Amino acid sequence: NICKLCSFKTTSKKLNMKKVFFLVATVLFLGCTNNGVENDCFPFITVNESVNLDLPQFIDLQVPGGWAYTSGGLQGLIIYNLNGVQFKAFDRLCPGQNPSSCSQMTVDSNLRILCQCDDSEFNILNGAPLTEGVTCFANEYLVDNLNGSLLRITNF
């Protein structure tokens, strides 16, 4: 009988350890989140666009400081040539706005990105808000310069 009691205690300890392990694993699993940047200002959309800089509609993108609009994203994209090699791309949807006729951002002559819904302005170099009280940045996408004349625009 003593051997059966010892066996019961060992089995009981194993069951308790399994419960503890399961509980810890569950807490760790549920407590983990992705390491991506949370963006409450825009709904998520997969972006995978190609832009051929040799096409006539993108001739302004061939020089540093040039910019152009193209399709893609939530309401189109703004592409900006930083220095002849590096490019920036931003969604034309105004941060924090639902798609509408006033929520498609434009670029002004001072190279600011403008939202006419709330008169907010954004820096074309990094998407930072220039308007006091605005906390959301313009939604930026990753631009890969594949061969000097072909750009690939995707989510980060």
What are these regions (language model features)?
Residues 34-109, 123-124, 139-156:
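N-terminal pre-ligand scaffold of iron-sulfur
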Residues 3-6:
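Cysteine-centered motifs
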Residues 13-20:
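Positively charged n-region of N-terminal signal peptides that target proteins for export
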Residues 108-118, 129-141:
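Short cysteine/histidine-rich metal-coordination sites, predominantly Zn2+-binding motifs
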Residues 28-31:
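C-terminal motif of bacterial Sec signal peptides marking the signal peptidase cleavage site
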Residues 21-25:
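Sec-dependent signal peptide hydrophobic core
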